[in-house]
Amino acid sequence: MESRAAVDDAALGREAWSVLDANSTGAATVPAPGLYPHQWNWDSTFVAIGLARWDTRRAGTELLSLLAGQWHTGMVPHIVFQPAREEVYFPGPAVWRSTEHRAAPHGVCTSGLTQPPLQALALWWVWRHAADRDTAVALVRRIYPMLVAQHDYLATSRDLGGGGLAAIVHPWESGMDDSPVWDAPLEALPPVRHAYRREEPSPWHPDSHHDRYMALVLGYRDSGYDPAYLRDEHPFAVEDPMFNGIWLASCQALVELAPVAGADAGPHREAVERIRAALLDRLWADGVFRARDLRAGRLSSIRTVGSFGPLLDQGLPADKIAELVGTLESASFMGAAGYPVPSCEIRAPQFDRSCYWRGPSWVNTNWLLRRAAAVHGLVGLVRVLGSQTLRLVRQAGFRECFDPFDGSGRGSRDFSWSAALTLDLLADTVEC
């Protein structure tokens, strides 16, 4: 097992800043050197969250650089490409062809997919913690209309099931790319073969689905990124509890931000109620939230870290909170992992301690669950998740993810959201 000498909080903070400075392009922060040379949606948003207590302007610049890629439909893309390195990553701009679409932003190359709509929660976090209040208020007023457009897009173009939830149309949109939850929807696709640039498959990813990933990309692209195609023909459509839990939390953030922007909070309150009711009606089963495969018409049998996303809801019924926390703290998740929270139920046959989103623990989902615990006044759980996450990065550095049993690092080194969220955790504030 790889480990390093213990570091104190001050040294850990300096290391985190060094990672973020090294990964900065000036306006944006790439996830990690080498493998991820562009700006990823929720990576960049977590960076803004981590910067919020320390540098209001830089956090705002991070969000604005991502939103420069927003489409006229309101969709915020999952990748904004850096012009100097467009062909370094596959699939790059030549595959997505966003510049050929009239709804895409002018002069910016992006993907055609989105990721969890965390931006409103991040903006609220920046506004809440800003030392520079004038800058924070100006930022809210500038970004708020963009977030309203984003949420309108999700409510209209992505309610593919007609029940009030947003559907993802590709595993990449979940942010949890290789989760076993996507296995069944992917395996239902017809066999397909596309040339994949990687000569040697990554040991961290299951390689069997990459051709299907590309088939989904090309089908959506060739439709002209048509929302009617997504509704009627696209073969992958899943209502994910983490995606929708984040959407609900961002709607709650917009309730707080609307008055700052001089807007009416009423529509956001209505959205909160609508999404909450839909989550409980459509995704709750056997004590947890489960992803719904819209094409197969069934719920996933697999419990993952995504099952706990709706815990971010301040208004979740008390009995559901108790059941979710009981499962989270059980031997299926935190109770049997020395370094929580594993991304897949430990007892599931699909669990793999080394494979992305099929077992390893992640700083970003730990942060989200810590935030969820704080929302519900679960001080003990807040402290455990905070201390155990800092233990991971102290021991293994700012890795992409971590073995849930021994804490060893997995994936990329010098990973930006791991560094940024460490800065937030080092503030050591239990916010309930």
What would you call each of these model-derived segments?
Residues S44-G74, G306-L316, N366-V379, G386-T389:
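Alpha-helical support elements that line or immediately flank enzyme active sites
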Residues E100-T114, L118-D132, L368-A372:
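Hydrophobic/aromatic-rich effector regions of fungal transcription factors
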Residues Q115-P180:
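Internal, well-ordered domain-core segments that constitute the primary functional module
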Residues S44, A48, P116, A120-L123, ...:
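TPR repeat positional signature
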Residues G50, A122-W125, H129, S250-A253, ...:
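Core register positions within helices of long alpha-helical scaffolds
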Residues E2-Q39, L66-H106, G164-E239, R274-P360, ...:
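Extended glycan-interaction surfaces of carbohydrate-active proteins
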Residues D8-A16, D55-A68, R133-A155, S250, ...:
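Extended, well-ordered alpha-helical scaffold segments
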Residues F236-I275, C355, P360-L381:
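Long, repeat-rich segments with strong aromatic
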